[in-house]
Amino acid sequence: MVGTKRIAYIKEGKGPPILLLHGNPTSSFLWRNVIPELSGLGEVIAPDLIGQGDSDKLPVEEGPLRYTFEVVYRYLADFLEAIGVRESVTIVAHDWGTALGFYWAQQNPDSIRAIAYMEGIVCPLDSWADWPEDAVGIFKGFRSKKGEDLILERNLFIEGVLPNSILRNLT
């Protein structure tokens, strides 16, 4: 529990913490095939960020900005503190999780052992003009009135965006 909210997470293995941070809008399910491979190397911790996966959701009444970076980061930092993640941390992060992980590392530099990331947010995107041209349409769609249906009902992010973002065949 973080405050009154439940943060769901998977924890497997023993040893130094390996923190898996998913992107938006996904969950710890993203790491389902990675966790078994890493659990022999340390204690793998894969939380569902607040509002995603099996973690509690914030009240709709709090408005459309209830999941700002600051809010999500605070829940993540408080969660890590609550479960005792403090030293020799390896962060493995994807997408939105990279921004959260990088910031946690900046705030806790003596706690970091290593960082690995993919599809990271490494610089600000101030406007749609800063986005890759072929991504603008779909991501604007996710932010439209149809966005919830596209993501939750049609699973377009997981089934469409992620697989189509791979630039080469995976081995």
Model-derived features with residue positions:
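N-terminal cap/lid subdomain of alpha/beta-hydrolase-fold enzymes
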Residues: P36, P47-I50
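A generic structural motif
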Residues: G40-V44
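Flexible "cap/lid" subdomain of the alpha/beta-hydrolase fold that forms the substrate-access gate
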Residues: T4-I10, P17, L30-W31, I45, ...
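Short beta-strand element of the alpha/beta-hydrolase
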Residues: P16-H22
